A protein has these predicted regions:
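Short coil/turn motif common to extracellular beta-sandwich-like domains
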Residues: 12-14, 134-136, 258-260, 383-390, ...
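Solvent-exposed loop segments of extracellular immunoglobulin-like
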Residues: 401-405, 507-511, 612-616
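Extracellular fibronectin type III
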Residues: 454-467, 559-575
Protein backbone atom coordinates (compact mmCIF):
# COMPACT_ATOMS: atom_id res chain seq x y z
CA UNK A 1 0.00 0.00 0.00
CA UNK A 2 1.10 3.65 0.42
CA UNK A 3 0.71 6.32 3.03
CA UNK A 4 0.74 8.87 0.20
CA UNK A 5 -2.69 10.14 -0.75
CA UNK A 6 -4.24 9.01 -3.99
CA UNK A 7 -3.51 11.47 -6.80
CA UNK A 8 -1.15 12.46 -9.60
CA UNK A 9 2.50 13.06 -8.88
CA UNK A 10 5.42 14.38 -10.90
CA UNK A 11 9.12 13.81 -11.17
CA UNK A 12 10.79 14.78 -7.94
CA UNK A 13 7.78 14.04 -5.78
CA UNK A 14 8.08 11.32 -3.10
CA UNK A 15 5.60 8.46 -2.82
CA UNK A 16 5.83 6.36 0.38
CA UNK A 17 5.23 2.66 -0.36
CA UNK A 18 4.51 0.26 2.53
CA UNK A 19 4.89 -3.52 2.63
CA UNK A 20 2.99 -5.21 5.54
CA UNK A 21 3.88 -8.68 6.87
CA UNK A 22 1.93 -10.94 9.22
CA UNK A 23 4.40 -10.46 12.05
CA UNK A 24 7.18 -8.19 13.18
CA UNK A 25 10.40 -8.56 11.23
CA UNK A 26 14.02 -7.64 11.60
CA UNK A 27 15.66 -6.05 8.52
CA UNK A 28 19.37 -5.86 7.71
CA UNK A 29 20.90 -4.25 4.64
CA UNK A 30 18.97 -2.29 2.04
CA UNK A 31 16.04 -4.11 0.58
CA UNK A 32 14.75 -2.98 -2.83
CA UNK A 33 11.28 -2.82 -4.30
CA UNK A 34 10.98 -2.60 -8.09
CA UNK A 35 8.07 -0.45 -9.31
CA UNK A 36 6.53 -0.55 -12.77
CA UNK A 37 7.15 3.02 -14.07
CA UNK A 38 7.20 2.72 -17.82
CA UNK A 39 10.29 2.46 -19.97
CA UNK A 40 12.52 2.61 -16.94
CA UNK A 41 11.38 0.79 -13.79
CA UNK A 42 12.12 2.43 -10.48
CA UNK A 43 14.15 0.52 -7.89
CA UNK A 44 13.18 1.88 -4.49
CA UNK A 45 15.42 1.35 -1.47
CA UNK A 46 14.12 0.31 1.95
CA UNK A 47 13.82 3.27 4.28
CA UNK A 48 12.52 2.12 7.67
CA UNK A 49 10.29 -0.29 9.70
CA UNK A 50 12.63 -2.93 11.13
CA UNK A 51 11.13 -4.42 14.30
CA UNK A 52 7.62 -3.88 13.01
CA UNK A 53 5.34 -5.65 10.58
CA UNK A 54 5.32 -2.74 8.09
CA UNK A 55 8.38 -1.77 6.05
CA UNK A 56 8.59 1.62 4.34
CA UNK A 57 10.12 2.40 0.92
CA UNK A 58 10.40 6.07 -0.21
CA UNK A 59 10.01 6.38 -3.98
CA UNK A 60 11.29 9.65 -5.48
CA UNK A 61 9.75 9.94 -8.94
CA UNK A 62 12.42 10.13 -11.61
CA UNK A 63 12.45 11.93 -14.94
CA UNK A 64 10.56 10.01 -17.60
CA UNK A 65 8.90 7.65 -15.13
CA UNK A 66 5.14 7.35 -15.40
CA UNK A 67 2.27 5.12 -14.48
CA UNK A 68 -1.50 5.46 -14.64
CA UNK A 69 -1.88 3.30 -11.49
CA UNK A 70 1.35 2.84 -9.60
CA UNK A 71 2.19 -0.77 -8.75
CA UNK A 72 5.22 -2.96 -8.30
CA UNK A 73 6.74 -4.81 -11.21
CA UNK A 74 5.91 -8.46 -10.28
CA UNK A 75 5.27 -10.83 -7.40
CA UNK A 76 9.05 -11.04 -6.96
CA UNK A 77 9.58 -7.28 -6.99
CA UNK A 78 10.72 -7.30 -3.34
CA UNK A 79 14.40 -8.30 -3.28
CA UNK A 80 16.82 -8.75 -0.38
CA UNK A 81 19.61 -6.97 -2.28
CA UNK A 82 22.17 -8.75 -0.02
CA UNK A 83 20.09 -7.92 3.05
CA UNK A 84 17.83 -10.09 5.26
CA UNK A 85 14.25 -10.10 6.52
CA UNK A 86 13.64 -12.42 9.47
CA UNK A 87 11.23 -12.81 12.35
CA UNK A 88 12.34 -12.75 15.95
CA UNK A 89 13.12 -16.47 15.83
CA UNK A 90 15.38 -15.96 12.80
CA UNK A 91 13.04 -17.40 10.27
CA UNK A 92 13.48 -15.81 6.86
CA UNK A 93 10.39 -14.07 5.59
CA UNK A 94 8.69 -15.10 2.40
CA UNK A 95 8.97 -12.16 -0.01
CA UNK A 96 6.31 -13.14 -2.55
CA UNK A 97 3.89 -10.30 -3.18
CA UNK A 98 0.31 -10.32 -4.35
CA UNK A 99 -0.09 -10.36 -8.08
CA UNK A 100 0.10 -6.73 -9.37
CA UNK A 101 -3.40 -5.32 -9.64
CA UNK A 102 -4.91 -8.08 -7.49
CA UNK A 103 -6.24 -7.89 -3.95
CA UNK A 104 -3.68 -6.49 -1.47
CA UNK A 105 -1.42 -5.24 -4.25
CA UNK A 106 -0.26 -1.60 -4.33
CA UNK A 107 -2.30 -0.97 -7.46
CA UNK A 108 -5.43 -2.44 -5.86
CA UNK A 109 -4.98 -0.62 -2.55
CA UNK A 110 -4.08 2.86 -3.95
CA UNK A 111 -4.84 5.09 -6.95
CA UNK A 112 -1.53 6.89 -7.44
CA UNK A 113 -0.72 8.29 -10.86
CA UNK A 114 2.86 9.19 -11.94
CA UNK A 115 2.19 11.69 -14.68
CA UNK A 116 4.39 14.91 -14.67
CA UNK A 117 5.60 16.16 -18.07
CA UNK A 118 9.31 15.84 -18.82
CA UNK A 119 11.74 16.67 -21.60
CA UNK A 120 12.42 13.88 -24.02
CA UNK A 121 14.72 15.68 -26.44
CA UNK A 122 16.32 19.02 -27.39
CA UNK A 123 17.00 19.85 -31.03
CA UNK A 124 16.83 22.64 -33.61
CA UNK A 125 15.02 23.26 -36.87
CA UNK A 126 18.17 24.88 -38.25
CA UNK A 127 20.29 22.84 -40.61
CA UNK A 128 23.58 21.40 -39.48
CA UNK A 129 25.97 24.19 -40.49
CA UNK A 130 28.18 27.00 -39.24
CA UNK A 131 26.42 30.18 -38.17
CA UNK A 132 27.70 33.72 -37.85
CA UNK A 133 27.02 36.81 -35.78
CA UNK A 134 23.41 37.92 -36.10
CA UNK A 135 22.07 34.57 -37.26
CA UNK A 136 18.94 33.44 -35.40
CA UNK A 137 18.60 29.75 -34.51
CA UNK A 138 15.38 28.12 -33.21
CA UNK A 139 16.03 25.66 -30.37
CA UNK A 140 13.23 23.11 -29.84
CA UNK A 141 12.50 21.41 -26.51
CA UNK A 142 10.26 18.34 -26.86
CA UNK A 143 8.21 17.09 -23.88
CA UNK A 144 6.50 13.75 -23.46
CA UNK A 145 3.13 15.53 -23.54
CA UNK A 146 1.60 18.89 -24.24
CA UNK A 147 2.65 21.65 -21.87
CA UNK A 148 1.47 25.17 -21.18
CA UNK A 149 3.96 28.04 -20.85
CA UNK A 150 3.72 31.39 -19.08
CA UNK A 151 6.24 34.26 -19.19
CA UNK A 152 9.58 33.65 -20.92
CA UNK A 153 11.52 30.55 -19.93
CA UNK A 154 15.01 30.26 -21.36
CA UNK A 155 17.81 27.80 -22.05
CA UNK A 156 21.41 28.62 -21.19
CA UNK A 157 23.70 27.67 -24.08
CA UNK A 158 27.39 26.85 -23.96
CA UNK A 159 28.86 29.49 -26.32
CA UNK A 160 32.42 29.97 -25.19
CA UNK A 161 33.69 32.73 -22.93
CA UNK A 162 30.24 34.20 -22.47
CA UNK A 163 27.27 31.82 -22.38
CA UNK A 164 24.13 32.99 -24.15
CA UNK A 165 20.43 32.33 -23.63
CA UNK A 166 17.86 31.00 -26.05
CA UNK A 167 14.58 32.67 -25.10
CA UNK A 168 11.14 31.02 -25.36
CA UNK A 169 9.13 32.25 -28.34
CA UNK A 170 6.30 29.77 -29.02
CA UNK A 171 4.75 26.31 -28.55
CA UNK A 172 2.53 26.63 -25.46
CA UNK A 173 -0.22 23.98 -25.61
CA UNK A 174 1.94 21.61 -27.61
CA UNK A 175 4.61 19.10 -26.73
CA UNK A 176 7.30 21.13 -28.52
CA UNK A 177 8.48 24.52 -27.29
CA UNK A 178 10.60 26.81 -29.46
CA UNK A 179 13.37 29.03 -28.09
CA UNK A 180 15.26 31.66 -30.13
CA UNK A 181 19.05 32.18 -29.98
CA UNK A 182 20.77 35.06 -31.79
CA UNK A 183 24.52 34.58 -32.35
CA UNK A 184 26.50 37.39 -30.70
CA UNK A 185 30.04 38.56 -31.31
CA UNK A 186 32.44 36.33 -29.43
CA UNK A 187 30.14 33.30 -29.35
CA UNK A 188 31.94 30.18 -30.42
CA UNK A 189 31.44 26.43 -30.21
CA UNK A 190 32.23 23.48 -32.42
CA UNK A 191 28.95 21.73 -31.50
CA UNK A 192 26.21 23.85 -30.01
CA UNK A 193 24.71 22.48 -26.78
CA UNK A 194 23.26 23.74 -23.51
CA UNK A 195 25.44 24.22 -20.44
CA UNK A 196 24.07 21.49 -18.14
CA UNK A 197 21.09 19.27 -17.32
CA UNK A 198 19.58 22.25 -15.48
CA UNK A 199 20.04 24.69 -18.36
CA UNK A 200 16.26 25.01 -18.94
CA UNK A 201 15.18 27.83 -16.60
CA UNK A 202 11.66 29.07 -15.83
CA UNK A 203 12.92 32.68 -15.58
CA UNK A 204 9.88 33.60 -13.39
CA UNK A 205 7.55 31.71 -15.75
CA UNK A 206 5.94 28.24 -15.65
CA UNK A 207 5.83 25.08 -17.73
CA UNK A 208 3.00 22.73 -16.74
CA UNK A 209 1.15 19.72 -18.06
CA UNK A 210 -2.58 19.75 -18.82
CA UNK A 211 -3.39 18.86 -15.20
CA UNK A 212 -1.40 21.82 -13.97
CA UNK A 213 1.53 19.81 -12.74
CA UNK A 214 4.87 21.52 -13.11
CA UNK A 215 6.93 19.89 -15.81
CA UNK A 216 10.25 18.32 -15.02
CA UNK A 217 12.87 20.56 -16.62
CA UNK A 218 15.81 18.22 -16.33
CA UNK A 219 17.59 17.79 -19.66
CA UNK A 220 19.77 15.00 -20.95
CA UNK A 221 23.42 15.52 -20.12
CA UNK A 222 25.14 17.73 -22.73
CA UNK A 223 26.36 15.52 -25.54
CA UNK A 224 24.30 12.55 -24.38
CA UNK A 225 21.43 10.92 -26.25
CA UNK A 226 18.55 13.36 -26.61
CA UNK A 227 20.72 16.44 -26.07
CA UNK A 228 21.01 19.32 -28.53
CA UNK A 229 24.64 18.44 -29.17
CA UNK A 230 23.79 14.83 -29.94
CA UNK A 231 20.80 15.67 -32.15
CA UNK A 232 22.44 18.44 -34.20
CA UNK A 233 25.85 19.42 -35.58
CA UNK A 234 25.63 23.19 -35.32
CA UNK A 235 28.84 25.22 -35.28
CA UNK A 236 28.79 28.76 -33.92
CA UNK A 237 31.47 31.12 -35.21
CA UNK A 238 31.01 34.48 -33.59
CA UNK A 239 34.69 35.34 -33.83
CA UNK A 240 35.11 38.59 -35.71
CA UNK A 241 38.14 38.75 -38.01
CA UNK A 242 40.50 41.41 -36.69
CA UNK A 243 43.69 42.97 -38.00
CA UNK A 244 46.76 41.63 -36.23
CA UNK A 245 49.46 43.41 -38.20
CA UNK A 246 50.16 45.79 -41.08
CA UNK A 247 53.42 45.52 -43.00
CA UNK A 248 54.80 45.57 -46.54
CA UNK A 249 56.38 43.09 -48.91
CA UNK A 250 58.38 45.99 -50.36
CA UNK A 251 61.95 46.19 -49.06
CA UNK A 252 62.88 48.91 -46.59
CA UNK A 253 64.24 51.92 -48.40
CA UNK A 254 63.35 55.17 -50.12
CA UNK A 255 60.93 55.39 -53.03
CA UNK A 256 59.58 58.18 -55.21
CA UNK A 257 56.93 59.05 -57.78
CA UNK A 258 55.95 56.15 -60.00
CA UNK A 259 57.18 53.45 -57.62
CA UNK A 260 54.68 50.96 -56.18
CA UNK A 261 54.73 49.95 -52.52
CA UNK A 262 52.83 46.78 -51.57
CA UNK A 263 51.10 47.10 -48.19
CA UNK A 264 50.05 43.86 -46.46
CA UNK A 265 47.26 43.59 -43.88
CA UNK A 266 47.19 40.39 -41.82
CA UNK A 267 44.02 39.19 -40.08
CA UNK A 268 43.67 36.62 -37.31
CA UNK A 269 41.75 34.29 -39.66
CA UNK A 270 41.10 33.83 -43.35
CA UNK A 271 38.92 36.53 -44.87
CA UNK A 272 37.02 36.84 -48.13
CA UNK A 273 37.07 40.16 -49.98
CA UNK A 274 34.67 41.68 -52.46
CA UNK A 275 35.13 45.01 -54.18
CA UNK A 276 38.22 47.14 -53.67
CA UNK A 277 38.88 48.12 -50.06
CA UNK A 278 41.44 50.89 -49.55
CA UNK A 279 43.95 52.11 -46.99
CA UNK A 280 44.52 55.84 -46.52
CA UNK A 281 48.25 56.52 -46.12
CA UNK A 282 49.91 59.46 -44.38
CA UNK A 283 52.08 60.97 -47.13
CA UNK A 284 52.41 64.63 -46.24
CA UNK A 285 50.28 67.46 -47.58
CA UNK A 286 48.52 65.03 -49.93
CA UNK A 287 47.58 61.63 -48.52
CA UNK A 288 48.04 58.51 -50.63
CA UNK A 289 45.76 55.51 -51.11
CA UNK A 290 46.63 51.81 -51.26
CA UNK A 291 44.02 49.73 -53.11
CA UNK A 292 43.30 46.04 -52.54
CA UNK A 293 44.72 43.71 -55.20
CA UNK A 294 44.83 40.16 -53.81
CA UNK A 295 44.67 37.80 -50.83
CA UNK A 296 40.96 36.89 -50.59
CA UNK A 297 40.58 33.53 -48.88
CA UNK A 298 43.78 33.91 -46.87
CA UNK A 299 44.83 35.76 -43.73
CA UNK A 300 46.88 38.37 -45.59
CA UNK A 301 45.48 40.96 -47.98
CA UNK A 302 47.75 42.93 -50.33
CA UNK A 303 47.20 46.57 -51.30
CA UNK A 304 49.13 48.45 -54.00
CA UNK A 305 50.19 52.03 -53.36
CA UNK A 306 51.34 54.00 -56.41
CA UNK A 307 53.45 56.94 -55.28
CA UNK A 308 52.45 60.37 -56.58
CA UNK A 309 54.83 63.28 -57.05
CA UNK A 310 53.29 65.21 -54.14
CA UNK A 311 53.82 62.44 -51.58
CA UNK A 312 56.53 62.63 -48.94
CA UNK A 313 57.14 60.90 -45.61
CA UNK A 314 60.20 59.79 -43.68
CA UNK A 315 58.45 56.63 -42.39
CA UNK A 316 55.41 55.40 -44.31
CA UNK A 317 52.35 54.65 -42.19
CA UNK A 318 48.59 54.77 -42.58
CA UNK A 319 46.54 57.80 -41.64
CA UNK A 320 44.81 56.48 -38.50
CA UNK A 321 43.40 53.36 -36.88
CA UNK A 322 40.36 53.73 -39.16
CA UNK A 323 42.39 54.08 -42.36
CA UNK A 324 41.26 50.71 -43.75
CA UNK A 325 37.98 51.38 -45.56
CA UNK A 326 35.58 49.02 -47.37
CA UNK A 327 35.08 51.45 -50.27
CA UNK A 328 31.74 49.76 -51.07
CA UNK A 329 33.35 46.32 -50.76
CA UNK A 330 33.29 43.73 -47.99
CA UNK A 331 35.80 41.88 -45.82
CA UNK A 332 34.28 38.84 -44.10
CA UNK A 333 35.27 35.47 -42.72
CA UNK A 334 34.12 32.19 -44.25
CA UNK A 335 30.77 32.25 -42.43
CA UNK A 336 30.09 35.88 -43.28
CA UNK A 337 31.13 37.73 -40.12
CA UNK A 338 32.16 41.26 -41.06
CA UNK A 339 35.78 41.90 -40.18
CA UNK A 340 36.70 44.59 -37.71
CA UNK A 341 38.87 46.95 -39.74
CA UNK A 342 40.52 48.78 -36.84
CA UNK A 343 44.28 48.97 -37.37
CA UNK A 344 47.03 49.15 -34.73
CA UNK A 345 47.77 52.70 -33.62
CA UNK A 346 50.11 54.46 -36.03
CA UNK A 347 53.73 54.02 -35.02
CA UNK A 348 52.77 51.42 -32.40
CA UNK A 349 53.66 47.74 -32.40
CA UNK A 350 52.39 45.87 -35.48
CA UNK A 351 51.71 49.08 -37.40
CA UNK A 352 53.14 49.66 -40.86
CA UNK A 353 55.48 52.31 -39.51
CA UNK A 354 56.72 49.97 -36.77
CA UNK A 355 57.19 46.94 -39.02
CA UNK A 356 58.85 48.69 -41.96
CA UNK A 357 61.22 51.57 -42.70
CA UNK A 358 59.87 52.86 -45.99
CA UNK A 359 60.47 56.47 -47.01
CA UNK A 360 58.50 58.29 -49.66
CA UNK A 361 60.71 61.03 -51.04
CA UNK A 362 59.77 63.30 -53.90
CA UNK A 363 61.83 66.24 -52.64
CA UNK A 364 65.01 66.73 -54.64
CA UNK A 365 68.24 67.23 -52.72
CA UNK A 366 69.71 70.71 -52.45
CA UNK A 367 73.35 71.67 -53.03
CA UNK A 368 73.95 74.80 -50.97
CA UNK A 369 77.42 75.70 -52.23
CA UNK A 370 80.39 74.52 -54.26
CA UNK A 371 83.85 75.78 -53.42
CA UNK A 372 86.91 75.39 -55.64
CA UNK A 373 90.39 75.30 -54.19
CA UNK A 374 89.85 73.82 -50.71
CA UNK A 375 88.43 70.74 -48.95
CA UNK A 376 87.14 72.77 -46.02
CA UNK A 377 84.48 74.77 -47.79
CA UNK A 378 86.73 77.77 -48.35
CA UNK A 379 86.46 79.08 -51.90
CA UNK A 380 89.44 80.66 -53.64
CA UNK A 381 89.63 82.31 -57.04
CA UNK A 382 93.22 81.47 -58.01
CA UNK A 383 95.74 78.73 -57.37
CA UNK A 384 99.29 78.07 -58.43
CA UNK A 385 99.03 74.30 -59.00
CA UNK A 386 98.30 73.02 -62.49
CA UNK A 387 98.21 69.35 -61.43
CA UNK A 388 95.95 69.30 -58.37
CA UNK A 389 92.61 70.81 -57.43
CA UNK A 390 90.50 70.53 -54.29
CA UNK A 391 86.72 70.83 -54.43
CA UNK A 392 84.28 70.95 -51.50
CA UNK A 393 80.53 71.35 -51.23
CA UNK A 394 77.54 71.03 -48.96
CA UNK A 395 74.16 69.41 -49.62
CA UNK A 396 71.05 68.20 -47.83
CA UNK A 397 67.91 66.15 -48.33
CA UNK A 398 64.93 66.65 -46.04
CA UNK A 399 63.39 63.19 -46.36
CA UNK A 400 65.49 60.16 -47.27
CA UNK A 401 68.96 61.65 -47.10
CA UNK A 402 71.78 61.83 -49.61
CA UNK A 403 72.75 58.59 -51.32
CA UNK A 404 75.66 59.98 -53.35
CA UNK A 405 77.27 63.12 -54.71
CA UNK A 406 78.77 63.47 -58.17
CA UNK A 407 81.19 66.11 -59.40
CA UNK A 408 82.52 67.31 -62.73
CA UNK A 409 85.19 69.80 -63.85
CA UNK A 410 85.18 71.93 -66.93
CA UNK A 411 86.42 75.14 -68.52
CA UNK A 412 82.88 76.45 -68.80
CA UNK A 413 80.26 76.90 -66.12
CA UNK A 414 78.63 73.47 -65.67
CA UNK A 415 81.05 71.95 -68.17
CA UNK A 416 82.66 68.52 -68.10
CA UNK A 417 85.61 69.14 -70.43
CA UNK A 418 88.21 68.10 -67.83
CA UNK A 419 86.33 65.56 -65.71
CA UNK A 420 83.00 63.99 -66.58
CA UNK A 421 80.61 63.11 -63.74
CA UNK A 422 82.34 61.06 -61.05
CA UNK A 423 80.76 59.64 -57.86
CA UNK A 424 82.10 60.91 -54.56
CA UNK A 425 79.79 58.59 -52.54
CA UNK A 426 78.61 60.72 -49.61
CA UNK A 427 81.88 62.64 -49.20
CA UNK A 428 81.60 66.40 -49.40
CA UNK A 429 85.07 67.08 -50.74
CA UNK A 430 87.56 65.66 -53.19
CA UNK A 431 91.22 66.29 -53.97
CA UNK A 432 92.08 65.78 -57.62
CA UNK A 433 95.63 65.06 -58.74
CA UNK A 434 97.43 64.25 -61.97
CA UNK A 435 95.72 67.10 -63.79
CA UNK A 436 97.13 69.14 -66.66
CA UNK A 437 95.56 72.51 -66.10
CA UNK A 438 96.43 75.49 -68.24
CA UNK A 439 97.89 78.73 -66.98
CA UNK A 440 95.56 81.72 -66.89
CA UNK A 441 92.57 79.45 -67.51
CA UNK A 442 89.46 79.40 -65.34
CA UNK A 443 88.05 76.03 -64.29
CA UNK A 444 84.57 75.36 -62.91
CA UNK A 445 83.59 72.57 -60.50
CA UNK A 446 79.99 71.30 -60.68
CA UNK A 447 78.21 69.08 -58.14
CA UNK A 448 74.87 67.24 -58.08
CA UNK A 449 73.32 64.99 -55.42
CA UNK A 450 71.11 61.90 -55.58
CA UNK A 451 68.97 60.99 -52.57
CA UNK A 452 68.06 57.49 -51.41
CA UNK A 453 64.82 57.64 -53.38
CA UNK A 454 66.69 58.43 -56.62
CA UNK A 455 65.78 62.12 -56.80
CA UNK A 456 68.57 64.14 -58.41
CA UNK A 457 69.32 67.73 -57.46
CA UNK A 458 69.97 70.61 -59.79
CA UNK A 459 73.59 70.96 -60.88
CA UNK A 460 75.32 73.65 -58.86
CA UNK A 461 78.54 75.15 -60.21
CA UNK A 462 81.18 77.10 -58.34
CA UNK A 463 82.32 80.58 -59.35
CA UNK A 464 85.46 79.11 -60.90
CA UNK A 465 89.14 79.05 -60.08
CA UNK A 466 91.90 80.42 -62.32
CA UNK A 467 95.28 78.72 -62.66
CA UNK A 468 98.21 81.09 -62.15
CA UNK A 469 101.60 79.44 -62.52
CA UNK A 470 103.44 82.53 -63.89
CA UNK A 471 105.42 84.75 -61.54
CA UNK A 472 105.05 88.54 -61.65
CA UNK A 473 107.34 90.42 -64.04
CA UNK A 474 109.81 92.87 -62.52
CA UNK A 475 110.08 96.61 -63.03
CA UNK A 476 112.82 99.03 -61.91
CA UNK A 477 114.16 99.86 -58.45
CA UNK A 478 115.89 103.09 -57.48
CA UNK A 479 117.80 104.22 -54.39
CA UNK A 480 116.26 107.29 -52.84
CA UNK A 481 112.81 108.77 -52.86
CA UNK A 482 113.21 111.35 -55.62
CA UNK A 483 115.09 109.80 -58.45
CA UNK A 484 118.01 107.46 -58.15
CA UNK A 485 120.81 108.52 -55.82
CA UNK A 486 124.32 107.20 -55.51
CA UNK A 487 125.30 108.52 -52.07
CA UNK A 488 123.64 109.10 -48.73
CA UNK A 489 124.84 111.09 -45.81
CA UNK A 490 122.60 109.22 -43.33
CA UNK A 491 124.19 106.61 -41.13
CA UNK A 492 120.83 105.05 -40.17
CA UNK A 493 118.37 105.43 -43.03
CA UNK A 494 118.07 104.23 -46.59
CA UNK A 495 115.30 104.90 -49.11
CA UNK A 496 114.13 103.01 -52.17
CA UNK A 497 111.30 103.13 -54.68
CA UNK A 498 110.20 100.87 -57.50
CA UNK A 499 107.77 100.71 -60.36
CA UNK A 500 106.74 98.58 -63.33
CA UNK A 501 106.10 95.22 -61.56
CA UNK A 502 103.15 93.38 -63.18
CA UNK A 503 101.07 90.20 -62.77
CA UNK A 504 98.28 89.80 -65.37
CA UNK A 505 96.48 86.86 -63.71
CA UNK A 506 95.99 86.84 -59.96
CA UNK A 507 97.67 90.19 -59.36
CA UNK A 508 100.47 91.32 -57.06
CA UNK A 509 99.59 91.12 -53.39
CA UNK A 510 102.92 91.81 -51.68
CA UNK A 511 106.39 93.28 -52.21
CA UNK A 512 109.44 92.26 -50.23
CA UNK A 513 112.76 94.03 -49.97
CA UNK A 514 116.20 93.25 -48.60
CA UNK A 515 119.39 95.29 -48.14
CA UNK A 516 122.90 93.99 -48.54
CA UNK A 517 126.45 95.12 -49.08
CA UNK A 518 126.52 93.28 -52.39
CA UNK A 519 124.05 93.14 -55.22
CA UNK A 520 121.13 90.89 -54.18
CA UNK A 521 122.49 90.54 -50.66
CA UNK A 522 120.51 90.63 -47.42
CA UNK A 523 123.27 90.93 -44.83
CA UNK A 524 122.14 94.37 -43.78
CA UNK A 525 118.35 93.73 -43.81
CA UNK A 526 116.73 90.35 -44.44
CA UNK A 527 113.71 89.98 -46.68
CA UNK A 528 110.84 92.01 -45.27
CA UNK A 529 107.24 92.46 -46.46
CA UNK A 530 106.29 95.91 -47.65
CA UNK A 531 102.66 94.98 -48.46
CA UNK A 532 101.60 96.80 -51.59
CA UNK A 533 103.70 99.93 -50.99
CA UNK A 534 106.19 100.75 -53.76
CA UNK A 535 108.42 102.95 -51.59
CA UNK A 536 110.25 102.10 -48.43
CA UNK A 537 112.12 104.01 -45.77
CA UNK A 538 114.37 101.79 -43.71
CA UNK A 539 115.54 103.27 -40.44
CA UNK A 540 117.59 102.18 -37.43
CA UNK A 541 120.40 100.98 -39.65
CA UNK A 542 124.08 101.20 -38.85
CA UNK A 543 125.73 102.23 -42.07
CA UNK A 544 129.46 102.27 -42.64
CA UNK A 545 131.13 105.22 -44.26
CA UNK A 546 132.25 104.44 -47.74
CA UNK A 547 130.19 101.22 -47.91
CA UNK A 548 127.86 100.78 -50.85
CA UNK A 549 124.44 99.31 -50.01
CA UNK A 550 122.05 97.58 -52.41
CA UNK A 551 118.27 97.39 -52.06
CA UNK A 552 116.68 94.29 -53.64
CA UNK A 553 112.92 93.91 -54.35
CA UNK A 554 110.72 90.97 -55.38
CA UNK A 555 106.95 90.74 -55.92
CA UNK A 556 104.53 87.97 -54.88
CA UNK A 557 101.16 87.41 -56.54
CA UNK A 558 97.90 86.19 -54.97
CA UNK A 559 98.73 82.51 -55.28
CA UNK A 560 102.30 82.86 -54.05
CA UNK A 561 104.25 83.03 -57.29
CA UNK A 562 107.39 85.11 -56.65
CA UNK A 563 109.08 87.29 -59.23
CA UNK A 564 112.77 87.48 -59.94
CA UNK A 565 114.79 89.73 -57.65
CA UNK A 566 115.76 93.12 -58.99
CA UNK A 567 118.41 95.20 -57.21
CA UNK A 568 119.32 98.89 -57.20
CA UNK A 569 122.66 100.04 -58.53
CA UNK A 570 123.63 100.82 -54.97
CA UNK A 571 124.00 103.82 -52.72
CA UNK A 572 127.25 104.62 -50.89
CA UNK A 573 127.26 105.92 -47.34
CA UNK A 574 129.23 109.17 -47.27
CA UNK A 575 129.34 110.02 -43.59
CA UNK A 576 132.42 112.33 -43.58
CA UNK A 577 132.30 115.95 -44.76
CA UNK A 578 134.68 117.36 -47.43
CA UNK A 579 138.26 118.23 -46.49
CA UNK A 580 138.49 121.99 -45.97
CA UNK A 581 140.77 124.18 -48.06
CA UNK A 582 141.82 127.89 -47.81
CA UNK A 583 139.53 130.93 -47.81
CA UNK A 584 140.90 134.39 -48.87
CA UNK A 585 139.39 137.81 -48.22
CA UNK A 586 139.65 138.92 -51.74
CA UNK A 587 139.62 137.39 -55.12
CA UNK A 588 143.30 136.81 -55.60
CA UNK A 589 145.06 137.65 -52.37
CA UNK A 590 144.06 137.84 -48.77
CA UNK A 591 143.23 141.42 -47.80
CA UNK A 592 142.96 143.10 -44.43
CA UNK A 593 140.96 146.25 -45.22
CA UNK A 594 138.36 147.48 -47.58
CA UNK A 595 136.95 150.94 -48.11
CA UNK A 596 133.86 149.98 -50.02
CA UNK A 597 130.47 148.36 -49.31
CA UNK A 598 131.36 145.19 -51.25
CA UNK A 599 133.15 142.22 -49.75
CA UNK A 600 134.93 139.76 -51.95
CA UNK A 601 136.23 136.34 -51.02
CA UNK A 602 137.72 133.28 -52.71
CA UNK A 603 138.65 129.75 -51.62
CA UNK A 604 140.60 126.81 -52.80
CA UNK A 605 141.78 123.35 -51.74
CA UNK A 606 138.39 121.92 -50.61
CA UNK A 607 138.13 118.15 -51.53
CA UNK A 608 135.80 115.13 -50.93
CA UNK A 609 137.17 111.68 -51.74
CA UNK A 610 133.73 109.90 -51.90
CA UNK A 611 130.82 111.76 -53.31
CA UNK A 612 132.76 114.87 -54.26
CA UNK A 613 131.90 118.53 -53.69
CA UNK A 614 128.32 119.22 -54.65
CA UNK A 615 128.09 122.86 -53.54
CA UNK A 616 129.72 125.53 -51.39
CA UNK A 617 128.02 127.77 -48.87
CA UNK A 618 129.34 130.94 -47.26
CA UNK A 619 128.37 133.33 -44.47
CA UNK A 620 129.72 136.69 -43.15
CA UNK A 621 130.22 137.61 -39.50
CA UNK A 622 131.91 140.11 -37.22
CA UNK A 623 134.25 137.54 -35.91
CA UNK A 624 135.70 134.25 -37.21
CA UNK A 625 132.99 131.69 -37.94
CA UNK A 626 130.20 134.12 -37.17
CA UNK A 627 127.26 134.66 -39.48
CA UNK A 628 125.80 137.78 -37.95
Amino acid sequence: SSTTADGAYNAGDTVVVTVTFNEDLIVTGTLQLTLETGATDAEVDYTSGTGTATLTFNYIIGTGQKSSDLDYQSTTALALNSGTIKDASGNAATLTLATPGETNSLGANKAIVVKGAYVTSVSSDSSDATYKIGDVLPITVIFDQNVTVTETPRIKLETGTTDQYATYTSGSGNDTLTFSYTVAAGDTTADLDYTSTSALELNSGTIKDAAGNAATLTLASPGALGSLGANKAIVIDGNVPTVSSVSSTTADGAYNAGDTVVVSVTFNENVIVTGTPQIDLETGSTDGTASYVSGSGSTTLLFNYLIAASHNTSDLDYLSTSALELNSGTVKDAVGNNATLTLPATGAANSLGDNKAIMIDNVVPVISFVAEGGTDGVDIDYQSSATTLAISWSGSDLVSGISKYEYALGTTSGGTEVKTWISATTDTSVSLSGLSLSDATKYYASVKATDKAGNVSAVITGDGITIDITAPTVGTVSDGMDGDISFTASSTTLYAQWTGFKDPTSGITDYEYAIGTNSGGKDTKDWTSNSMDTTVTVTSLTLTNGQTYYVSVKAKDLVGNVSNVITTNGVTADLVGPIKGTVLDGLTADGEWINADTIRASWTGFTDPLSGIKKYQYCIGKFSGASD
